[in-house]
Amino acid sequence: MALCAYAFPGILNRTVAVASDASKPTPLFSEWIHGTDLQFQFHQKLTQVKKRSRTVQASLSESGEYYTQRPPTPIVDTINYPIHMKNLSLKELKQLADELRSDTIFNVSKTGGHLGSSLGVVELTVALHYVFNAPQDRILWDVGHQSYPHKILTGRREKMSTLRQTNGLAGFTKRSESEYDCFGTGHSSTTISAGLGMAVGRDLKGRNNNVIAVIGDGAMTAGQAYEAMNNAGYLDSDMIVILNDNRQVSLPTATLDGPVPPVGALSSALSRLQSNRPLRELREVAKGVTKQIGGPMHELAAKVDEYARGMISGSGSTLFEELGLYYIGPVDGHNIDDLISILKEVRSTKTTGPVLIHVVTEKGRGYPYAERAADKYHGVAKFDPATGKQFKGSAKTQSYTTYFAEALIAEAEADKDIVAIHAAMGGGTGMNLFLRRFPTRCFDVGIAEQHAVTFAAGLACEGLKPFCAIYSSFMQRAYDQVVHDVDLQKLPVRFAMDRAGLVGADGPTHCGAFDVTFMACLPNMVVMAPSDEAELFHIVATAAAIDDRPSCFRYPRGNGIGVELPAGNKGIPLEVGKGRILVEGERVALLGYGSAVQNCLAAASVLESRGLQVTVADARFCKPLDRALIRSLAKSHEVLVTVEKGSIGGFGSHVVQFMALDGLLDGKLKWRPIVLPDRYIDHGSPADQLAEAGLTPSHIAATVFNILGQTREALEVMT
């Protein structure tokens, strides 16, 4: 039996017995015991941190220098790819981070985008690209909205002026855009899973590159992150998980309970010490030894180790360690010295298994207007860097999101059983407005759409009337819960699906293309869509009145069209399954669904200007369909065109299914669907996206003329 001294500070100055075979020397133990005095290292590193904190130069942002014109960036100007960073000194790396932050502020001020998250990871981005060798080493950015500094350092700086614009750079990481974007993102909580897959694939291929998954900014509230960590701990493949902890749970309007506690010198020094290679390798050996001992000795060693981890890393390490990840932290995510030191140690340590580095950052770091804002400038329009003022265009109408919130508040005023649920998107869904009025009846579950849906199902079981407000594209994340926990049990949960259809600059990851297709196939679901903001009020009232089955409705991003709203913002419940005719015409009928009705009305004006008066109808419901309306249109017109801002398999498919079974296609009727094309449409302006999708009024009018054999007129309306 040999004695191994763990010389931790304070109460951990104790001797722990560890079994070893005296006949077999253990050079790792002896080298570490004789060459490492932890208390001495601790005090030494504490002194180093204190000295360093007194010599750090003020950054451009801390000096109050913000530029309406492009700021001077002499070091960034020399960096085209990460390889150009490798010979920079630590002082130059700090200046690089300052310049990178200023450059990010300037670029986003011209394009708009996700600013706060990118500012929070500047130092981390510099450290990662300095220590690791991308693209051979895989660096994954969860969600991807914090990837702007990464894009600047990986050959895309000159294109930053095209960010989120048509044919420009994406606002998230995108595999087809750069080899440095090893995994495409846009939704949260995916990178640990993807990174683990890459790590296992690397091992099976016999390679030795590093895999680093950066996750945080609210993404750790999603179950997939924990599923991935659980599997990572079991598979024990080498990978690094960096927890970017900016205390952000809800996006983009969460406010903090108080200031983020500072990551002090003690935590910094101990975290660097814990990443020390001899200590980690010792723990690997000790782990194997204690497994052989068994019994009380094993339990004692485990308790001492657990307490040591608590002393070294502060709070929060137990969960990650229990999942099988070696925990290091918390680390100051804005201290390049510490980040580089720890990343180098972790990279060079020859031990197996996943490592989690807990990095504490501040969203909006280095830009006071972002730091002071409640939303940390999570997503911004174009703005003046010198004042922080955003150039938001004045609109005569409010957004559909706001109209939905007002409609739901009006319903909740009259019905105390109405409650609201959202998944970390209070501002994005308008539920922050509902929260102000009904603080005990609004539930933010974090980025956890699966839980949100089943939580709403439980509320419905108790007689409440839940409205679950989730973006259309995020509803995809909870589809099994919609089917199994809601529709199968016929529970009256109401799904408000914002951002339906094309969404402009956010691109295909946020495009609400598929909700009608995957909702309308469910046997018990009522599926609705308003054609304007007044209809939205009526459909919210309709959903509140449907209490014997689930229902859903979609509405677009953007502002209303300016129609008169219902008195008192209180909608009137519609007859379920009944549409309406808006314009009476002949020969041709345009049957629109949702906001596409407005495109149909505009197309009708184009056709009328060329002598063709067409019928325009608003379906209102995809399920149940207004069969009487469809029969009437089919029998009284030569051509029926269904128009929707959704994918194949949606509203038009349900219409033609009914018409085929009803025999309405057995005669001379010509039916044509206009839907989103069967491909993902890249980010761009709403007008450009609509044109690419073939859903402009001119496209609809040209389709009508082509069906009628009037090809010349079709060409003319497109020019």
Swiss-Prot record:
Enzyme class: transferase
Compartments (UniProt record): Plastid, Chloroplast
Matching Gene3D superfamilies: 3.40.50.920, 3.40.50.970
Pathway of action: Metabolic intermediate biosynthesis; 1-deoxy-D-xylulose 5-phosphate biosynthesis; 1-deoxy-D-xylulose 5-phosphate from D-glyceraldehyde 3-phosphate and pyruvate: step 1/1
Single biological process term from Gene Ontology: terpenoid biosynthetic process
Record-linked SUPFAM superfamilies: Thiamin diphosphate-binding fold (THDP-binding), TK C-terminal domain-like
A GO CC annotation given for this chain: chloroplast
Residues binding thiamine diphosphate: 145, 186-188, 218-219, 246, 367, 449
Transit peptide, residue positions per record: 1-57
UniProt keyword terms in alphabetical order: Chloroplast, Isoprene biosynthesis, Magnesium, Metal-binding, Plastid, Thiamine biosynthesis, Thiamine pyrophosphate, Transferase, Transit peptide
GO-annotated molecular function: 1-deoxy-D-xylulose-5-phosphate synthase activity; metal ion binding
Chain positions recorded as Mg(2+) binding sites: 217, 246
Record's cofactor remark: Binds 1 Mg(2+) ion per subunit. Binds 1 thiamine pyrophosphate per subunit.
Pfam families: DXP_synthase_N (PF13292), Transket_pyr (PF02779), Transketolase_C (PF02780)
Highest taxon of source: Eukaryota
EC numbers, comma separated: 2.2.1.7
Keyword Cell division in annotation: no
UniProt keyword annotation of Glycosyltransferase present: no
Catalytic activity, as annotated: D-glyceraldehyde 3-phosphate + pyruvate + H(+) = 1-deoxy-D-xylulose 5-phosphate + CO2
Cofactor requirements of the protein: Mg(2+); thiamine diphosphate
Subunit text: Homodimer.
Function description: Catalyzes the acyloin condensation reaction between C atoms 2 and 3 of pyruvate and glyceraldehyde 3-phosphate to yield 1-deoxy-D-xylulose-5-phosphate (DXP).
Family label: Belongs to the transketolase family. DXPS subfamily.
Protein name stated in the entry: Probable 1-deoxy-D-xylulose-5-phosphate synthase, chloroplastic
Gene designation: TKT2
